[in-house]
A protein has these predicted regions:
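Extended, hydrophobic alpha-helical segments in both membrane/secreted and soluble proteins
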Residues: 47-49, 53, 63-77, 86-95, ...
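Active-site-proximal beta-strand/loop segments in catalytic clefts of secreted hydrolases
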Residues: 1, 22, 38-39, 50-53, ...
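Metal-dependent peptidase/peptidase-like ectodomains
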Residues: 3, 44, 93-197
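Acidic active-site catalytic centers that drive phospho-/nucleotidyl reactions
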Residues: 54, 62-63, 133, 184
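Short helix-capping segments at alpha-helix termini
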Residues: 81-83, 121-122
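Soluble non-cytosolic domains of exported or imported proteins
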Residues: 26, 60-68, 82, 105-109, ...
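Soluble metallo-hydrolase cores and metallopeptidase-like ectodomains found primarily
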Residues: 1-61, 72-82
């Protein structure tokens, strides 16, 4: 279909297309969050890396790229033999795009269930959730990290010590707060876990 559209657009600047989608809601389905960990020297303290693997359409940008990024970090850490101070937990979340029927707030259900049902004991142990969302989205010459208020000053200091990042994003590299409701870090934040995400808005 894409090739047909490309050919048609060679002849005209604008074309009209009709999209006919057949989608079905299947209630009472089970989804699974997939987690792994690299044990740290202080196993009672954890850093959570999260991304979601469910998607609308093909999901390359939202959010399979983030899952691949997260797994790449895990693979590199394991191959290096490095033992972190804090246990690092990697969690590929389900049901971020949609997971609740008959609600105005139907997204981020997998992360909500992860922290409020499956692992409420993480609260007080996870010192930070680094959530990855749409990391391949081109922002041109600017980059932002969206964070909870408590980590803004720390992250600003951290960014000031990364001159290469400033070169990569000369227009702007900054921290913005607060966390928004659009991604899984929100569920972690409302549970009391300090959270941050690459800003994609």
């Amino acid at each position: 279909d894409a090739e047909v559209l490309k050919e048609l657009l060679k002849e005209k600047e604008e074309i009209q297309v009709f999209f006919d989608a057949d989608s079905q809601v299947m209630p009472s389905c089970t989804t699974y969050n997939i987690c792994g960990r690299i044990p740290g020297k202080h196993p009672e303290r954890m850093i959570l890396l999260s991304a979601h693997y469910d998607s609308y359409f093909s999901g390359f940008q939202d959010d399979n790229t983030a899952v691949a990024l997260m797994f790449g970090i895990a693979k590199s850490l394991m191959e290096s033999g490095y033992q972190p101070n804090n246990t690092i937990v990697f969690c590929a979340m389900a049901a971020e795009e949609w997971g609740v029927i008959d609600s105005d707030f139907d997204w981020s259900a997998g992360a909500y269930e992860q922290i409020f049902t499956a692992h409420p004991e993480w609260v007080g142990k996870v010192i930070a959730d680094l959530n990855f969302e749409l990391p391949a989205l081109a922002h041109g010459t600017r980059a932002r990290i969206r964070s909870c208020y408590e980590y803004v000053r720390y992250l600003e200091e951290f960014l000031s010590n990364l001159p290469l990042l400033t070169q990569a994003y000369p227009e702007e590299t900054r921290i913005t707060a607060p966390i928004e409701t659009w991604s899984d870090d929100f569920s972690m934040a409302i549970a009391g876990i300090p959270s941050m995400v690459n800003d994609f808005t």
